[in-house]
A protein has these predicted regions:
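Active-site and donor-binding regions of nucleotide-sugar-utilizing enzymes
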Residues: 1-71
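Structural alpha-helical scaffold elements that stabilize or flank donor/cofactor-binding regions
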Residues: 4, 30, 128, 172-173
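Helix N-cap/beta->alpha junction signal
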Residues: 40-43, 140-142, 184
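Donor nucleotide-activated moiety binding/catalytic core segment of transferases
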Residues: 143-189
Length: 215
């Protein structure tokens, strides 16, 4: 980032979520050299100071505004389970919002797509949702949204919804859902903040940690 600054320009690092992975290659003071680093939790602030070389004066604790509207009590049961996996950099659409035929073919052949199609179309899942009268909403990371149509197997049951970011609001889904299933996404902090149950589906942890983000 140093190469993109104007002379004497001050830079502030704002986050979209709490840091949980090793991002030293991009945020270390020796690399990015931010004048101010905004953190969301006291333990995160401590980690940024101790691990990434920022001073207590330059690393400030403000909280995270995306938590402000999250209720601390979940009194109404919605009978809804939310699945929100994060993206994999090796199967992203170059365009960002539209996937080409070739990119979709690569995506469909990847373990990520195959495992979620298998899960979403599971007979056991369908029977369980019907037994307990639950709806399952599948809302993948926005980088996966261009491939939403690749999860066609999920359409075998009306109890599974493929949620597009054009039609569904992330925070509303988080608030309304009774349970979250994710993988390596920091979205689990939002659900933990609301003290609601979570489960982790990490079938490709070794590949993810080896070629995406280190823990």
């Amino acid at each position: 980032l140093r190469n993109f600054r104007k002379k004497n320009q001050k830079t502030v690092f704002l986050q979209h979520g709490i840091i949980k992975d090793n991002l030293s290659h991009g945020i270390d003071a020796s690399v990015a050299g931010m004048d101010m680093f905004v953190t969301s939790a006291s333990r995160e602030q401590q980690a940024v100071i101790e691990r990434h070389g920022y001073t207590s004066e330059s690393c400030i604790l403000t909280g995270l505004c995306r938590f402000d509207n999250l209720p601390l009590e979940h009194s109404v049961k919605s009978k809804q389970i939310l699945i929100m996996p994060t993206f994999r950099h090796w199967i992203m659409a170059a365009n960002g919002t539209y996937a080409t035929k070739e990119e979709k073919e690569k995506f469909v052949s990847d373990e990520f797509c195959q495992m979620y199609n298998k899960l979403l179309s599971s007979k056991r899942l369908k029977e369980t949702l019907e037994k307990y009268d639950y709806i399952l909403v599948f809302y993948p990371h926005y980088c996966v949204q261009p491939f939403l149509e690749c999860f066609q197997d999920a359409k075998r049951t009306e109890r599974v919804i493929l949620a597009s970011n054009k039609d569904y609001d992330v925070q509303r889904l988080l608030i309304e859902s009774d349970m979250l299933i994710t993988d390596f996404s920091s979205i689990f902090f939002d659900f933990a903040y609301m003290k609601k149950p979570e489960a982790f589906f990490q079938f490709d942890e070794e590949k993810y940690r080896g070629g995406h983000y280190e823990e």
